[in-house]
Amino acid sequence: MALNTEKNTYTLLFAVGLVVIVGTLLAAIDSSLKDKIRINKILEKQQNILYAIGINENEGNSVNFIAADKAEKEFNKYITKQIYIQGDQVIEDDKAYLIDVKKQKALAKDPSHKRKLPLFIAEKDGRNLYVAPIRGKGLWDAIWAYVSVDEDMIIRGIYFDHKAETPGLGANIKQRFFMDDFIGESLLDS
């Protein structure tokens, strides 16, 4: 018995079969890559923090992070202490970089939740630098940054990123010339 490919049932069964096969493949790929994705997100965060304290491979006007395979080693070398602030408590935690600032911001809407605010203390060239994550709204979507300041509250480095800003002016926050404009500015200037 030959299949009648002219009927609607054939088309429907073919479409359902294709969806099941492709969906299964995508689910298998997603679950097999979960660990790699998680590790890459951690490395990216470490690279961002390192960039904010001036540990990068800059060439010209580009923003070049330290290589991913060196990020963890360099992070552990320069970041001497990790803490987070929760309510009125300061808690030392060597995994503070795992705190998701976006999720903490969303949880802050619940008055019973005390959100965790991470702070990274680095030592570079004999001086302490304090790196804090910042998150806010851009024109179209979220903007976030890591800003490093010294004991005098002078900005020593910053790294900006965004999810979906306009290709023109908004996307310039990822350009080195934009980030370099903040270096040397005081947080305490009025």
Model-derived features: where do they sit?
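Flexible, solvent-exposed loop/hinge segments and secondary-structure transition points
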Residues: A2-S190
